Amino acid sequence: MKSTSKLQEMKLKNITEIAESVGLSEDDIELYGKYKAKISLDVLKQKPRQREGKVILVTSINPTPYGEGKTTTAIGLSMAINRLGFKSIVTLREPSLGPYLGIKGGATGGGVAQVLPSTDINLHFTGDIHAVTSANNLLCAAIDNHIYHGNELNINPKAVMVKRAMDMNDRALRNIVIGLGDGQRGAVREDGFIISVASEVMAILCLSNDLEDLKERLGNILVGFSYDKKPIYAKDLKVHGAMALLLKDAIKPNLVQTSEATAAIIHGGPFANIAHGTNSIIAIKIAQKLSDYVVVEAGFGADLGAEKFVNIVSRKSGIYPSAAVMVVTTKALKYHGSMGAKENLTSENIDTLKKGFKNLEKHIENLKLLGLEAIVTLNRFPHDTPAEISEIESFCKERGVEFAVSEAYELGSEGALDLAQKVIEVASRKRKINFVYEDSDPVEEKIRKVAKTIYGAADVQFSKSALLGLELIKKLNIDHFPICMAKTQYSLSDDPKLLGRPKDFVLNVNEIRINNGAQFIVVICGDIMTMPGLSKDYAALHLDIDEDGNVVWV
């Protein structure tokens, strides 16, 4: 057995030193041991802004199943900006246990570009996801308890819209029946579980401005409908106050450190394929107060994380990126160029690599459409050849796009200095963010605009269920909400096998869900699951612990 981390013997700095390095006093933080802390919300309310706080958005092309290293690149970039004499904080999402124990492994970076203590962060961290799970499941318990004790609100059990949650990949819980037994176990009805980070409670946590806003949004969660088709909200069940209480610490961002002892803020964990895919507004705003450059990682490709950052996060918070880093790997380009072949992706193949440029080209175009200038960044692997790197650089130069190579995995900040310098240069230019759609557009029109503009779809096909959802949105008078597209991360389309830059395809909208508390509409496209399953050879089979408490990979 060997250690999973090159940094397990590194001596971490006390988190109070990290806090001090960005202008936070001991009164501004709440300690969770020596190396983790919560940041007080008073920092956002009372502390004067010390820095300019330009936001750098890190995104990618459509990834392979193993990811392309956005987190590693984001951490390396932030460390490199600090090395150049500026103040930078990287803000990331908290890893979910499901993917950590499933296919993807940890989400704390890699090599010598990590956030630490990585094992704690990847496992239970400060308990935020547990709190989200508890708040969600309190609401679910309250619904069934209300029905059991007389059902004063006349809730139709078949019209309940909130599902239970857990932070684990477990396909057996996607669809279940509850209340079975002798009649003393509540109403028998169909239910199901979603992974906690896909819950509306998680989205609300990341989009709230403060505790008061959090409580109000929780109260506005659309629980379901009565038998006479009246909407029922969480506030009608009078549990939104207790839900907010469960989240009173979870709403505070978490301060940790990078492998070069620079500050990192980790908070919230919404997936980008089934949610909006960015850490919390509170975390980013606090980081803006304390640094010159805030490096923000947006989940999956620019068709998901970056699109939603602009159309949901920027629209709601006024946080606008000054530059965008587009992470690519030779492996991902060849994956798209070979239309999904997983063999020989680490061998030089210039023709296949160049075929994959079509996917990169569309993502560069999308960032321009959103008003962002891209710095295409190759996350370099040992198998990358000079010829492959030269081809990518030439492709970018021909299109007037900045290009950099990041070797942060192997070299830390030293391997990302060129990237950092180019990011600072691009961020100095004034940009105007463009929204893909207007608030006033009908939801159907918003969907068509994203599908055609960002994905390149020829048309959109709505199922009967989706059409009913559109009608319900009009009845509830929430057409002004932004949309959160839920689709595969592997393709620009809703078909994970349709790689490269597909054209003339029809985007299939199968379902419309209303996240009334989070204030966005979830648009389910294709076969997308809100509760993942485990693969045959999942990561947990290879994880172990040694006698000193260190994680080992079997």
Curated annotation (Swiss-Prot):
Q: Name one Pfam family in it.
A: FTHFS
Q: What is the lineage of its organism?
A: Bacteria, Bacillati, Bacillota, Bacillota incertae sedis, Caldicellulosiruptorales
Q: What is this protein called?
A: Formate--tetrahydrofolate ligase
Gene3D superfamilies per record: Domain 2, N(10)-formyltetrahydrofolate synthetase (3.30.1510.10), Formyltetrahydrofolate synthetase, domain 3 (3.10.410.10), P-loop containing nucleotide triphosphate hydrolases (3.40.50.300)
Tell me which family the UniProt entry assigns to this protein.
Answer: Belongs to the formate--tetrahydrofolate ligase family.
The entry lists its GO molecular-function terms as: ATP binding; formate-tetrahydrofolate ligase activity
Species for this entry? Caldicellulosiruptor saccharolyticus (strain ATCC 43494 / DSM 8903 / Tp8T 6331)
| A biological-process GO annotation | tetrahydrofolate interconversion
> Which keywords fit this entry according to its UniProt record?
ATP-binding, Ligase, Nucleotide-binding, One-carbon metabolism
Report the NCBIfam families cross-referenced here: PRK13505.1
- Which reactions does this protein catalyse? (6S)-5,6,7,8-tetrahydrofolate + formate + ATP = (6R)-10-formyltetrahydrofolate + ADP + phosphate
The superkingdom listed in its UniProt entry is Bacteria
In which residues is ATP bound? 64-71
Q: In which pathway does it act?
A: One-carbon metabolism; tetrahydrofolate interconversion
- Enzyme Commission number: 6.3.4.3
Which InterPro entries has this protein been placed in?
Answer: Formate_THF_ligase (IPR000559), P-loop_NTPase (IPR027417)
